[in-house]
Every structure is written in structure tokens, then in C-alpha cells.
Amino acid sequence: MAAVDSFYLLYREIARSCSCYVEALALVGAWYTARKSIPVICDFYSLVRLHFIPRLGSRPDLIKQYGRWAVISGATDGIGKAYAEELASHGLNIILISQEEEKLQAVAKHIADTYRVETLVLVADFSRGREIYAPIREALRDRDIGILVNDVGAFYPYPQYFSQVPEDTIWDIVNVNIAAASLMVHIVLPGMVERKKGAIVTVSSGSCCKPTPQLAAFSASKAYLDHFSRALQYEYASKGIFVQSLIPFYVTSSVTAPGSFLRRCPWLAPSPRVYAQHAVSTLGISKRTTGYWSHSIQFLFAQYMPEWLWVWGANLLNRSLRKEALSSQA
């Protein structure tokens, strides 16, 4: 018993002498927990404030806020077409730009008949480079361009290793993804500055968050658009221009054609129409957003996860999408 009592007394003495260290470790643990938890709580609040609260109120008057006409590039498919329809539902006149005249005319007629707004179509193949911009500049001259949506984009046929990407596709990514957005902004921006109002929305991609294997050139071009938009916002916010970098993840579009798994999860990959309804509600509120609540959750995971985990997940998903695309071609 004496040995037991001696051990118990020794334990109490050690515990008493270490109590200050235990308290210090508890404080460090509390500080670390708060440091990790507070940003997550703030991000969750921002998600609710951005994606849900604005949709509870009345629709904003986009014509009064920005101007009467909206220009949308890449307007015959996917997000571009849906965004054009959503802006038309707010009463804006729509200028549609794409390379497929027949589809342009069909979309323009549908928008004009459905929403009773004016429409104008401009046929332009952005992959042809510099020569196409003079006619666009002339067509937009003296118009009250309130909103520009840069959605035109070139995409891989399916995820591929860079050495397997056709050279024409690489040039398309440079001319369509990078040059088109830059020059369209250069065309409409002077008029917006003169009127002291306007909005520029440039559609980037969730693949710009971190290096994305098997979409190397595409994700790099979208990273350019993200940085370009954010820099423009700093340059022109004081002049009344709102610039938004829109960073969607997958939508169920014929342009991106996600695999069957994503098509079975509409909350992960919404339809272009649902996506556009949510994205337009963030206009004037967030300078950099995914545009859709579940995409914002995916973006938060991407921001907080280590790069090696992102690369592993991207490789896993893109291998699956490539395998599915190749098997459908066989």
C-alpha cells in the first residue's frame, strides 16, 4: 500500500507542477480551433448571403443599374445562351455573338418572342483572330452597352494529356479564351467609362483554382481570365464599372458534356438555365464568385485542400471522363 500511496502522491505532484503547461496547451488548442473555424463560419455566412438572400427579395433593375443593352459572346449554347435569356427576362435588349448564324437567329427569335425585347445577332468566329473585331466594334458603336458577358470559349474535346492535344485546339484556346475576352472588354469599356456605369462578366472555370492535369492549357487560359477580371475591377471600380469573375464548375451542357456520374447529380452540375438564374442574382454583389451555391461549396473545398489532393482528384475525374468519351467514340 505504501508503494501505491507513494505513486499516487508522485502523480499528484507531477500533475500540479504541469498544470500551467496543460493550460498553455489548452489555450494553443483553442486558438488553433478558432483560427480554423472562424474562416469556415465566415465562408458559410458569405455563401448564404450571396446565393440565397438576394433571391428572396425583389429583382434588381438591371437597366437602371447598368444600361439597356447586353452583349453576350458564345450565346448559342450552355451558360452563354442561358445567361442571355435570364438578362432578357430582366428587360434588357440582347446582342448575341457566335459563329453559327443559323443557331444565332433561332436563339434571337426565341428571346425576342418570349421576352419581348430587341435582339441583334453578330456572326463572328473568334478563332480567326484579329480580323473579326473591327466589324464588332462598328456594330456596337453608339449603343448603350450596359452589360458584357464574355462566355465564348474553346474546350478540349475531352480531358487529354497536353502532348495529345491538337495544335489547332491550342490556338483556339489562345484566340477564343484569352484574346476574345480581352478585346471585347477593350471595345465596350470606353463607353461604360463615359456613362459611368456598366458591368463586365467574364466566365472563367473552376479548373483555374489550382493546376489541373489533363486540362493544362484550358485551365491556364481560365486562370488568365480570372486574374484579368480581378485586376480590371481594381482599375475601374472607382469609375462606376462592376467587373465580375465568374468561376463555374461543371454544368450539364453540351459544351462541357460532363460524364454520366455528374448528370446523375444535378445539385453538383446544374442545368445552364438554373445556373444562369443564380449567377445573375450575384451581379453587383460579388466581384468573384462561382455563381451557384453547390459550386461555391466545391470552390471552398478546392481552396482549403492541399494541391496534391486537388491534382489526385482532378486526375481521377478526368481519366474517367476521357475513358467515357473514348468508349463512346469506339
UniProtKB/Swiss-Prot annotation:
Region of interest (Required for mitochondria translocation), residue spans: 2-82
Location, primary (coarse class): mitochondrion
Residues with N-acetylalanine modification: 2
Compartment(s) where it occurs, according to its Swiss-Prot or TrEMBL record: Mitochondrion
InterPro entries recorded: 17-beta-HSD3-like, NAD(P)-bd_dom_sf, SDR_fam
Superkingdom, natural source: Eukaryota
Keyword Transferase (UniProt): no
SUPFAM superfamilies (UniProt xref): NAD(P)-binding Rossmann-fold domains
Family annotation (Gene3D superfamilies): NAD(P)-binding Rossmann-like Domain (3.40.50.720)
Binding-site residues, NADP(+): 74-80, 125, 222
Family label: Belongs to the short-chain dehydrogenases/reductases (SDR) family. 17-beta-HSD 3 subfamily.
Subunit structure: Interacts with STYXL1.
Protein name per UniProt: Inactive hydroxysteroid dehydrogenase-like protein 1
Organism of origin: Rattus norvegicus
Name of the coding gene: Hsdl1
